[in-house]
Amino acid sequence: MPREPDPPSPAPQDAAMNVVYRITYPNGKIYIGQDRTNSINYFGSASDELIARDFTPEQRRSFTVTRDILWESETASRSEVTQVEFEFILRYRSNDPAVGYNRNPPFAGSGRV
């Protein structure tokens, strides 16, 4: 009886890939974050409380978020990745509560400290 073929090898992990990403929620608000492993299922550490305020229980039953890679590097240091993330937060104004869910750096017009 012929031997069954070996299963395909899993896709290689981009374990060394640093990325800065943008999450877009159904209401159009965004969150900018970084991931130093480029995990396929990591969607950031935005405040659950802040996001939940913007959605009704019915809206929370089914929704879609989008994750876009804005920048990537195999060689950037942690501080370089953090600097790029900071620059994208300011560029996209995702720290403005009307625009996004980033809490840092504090938005100048928000009164937050």
Would you name each region that the model predicts?
Residues 2-113:
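Structure-specific nucleic-acid interaction/processing domains
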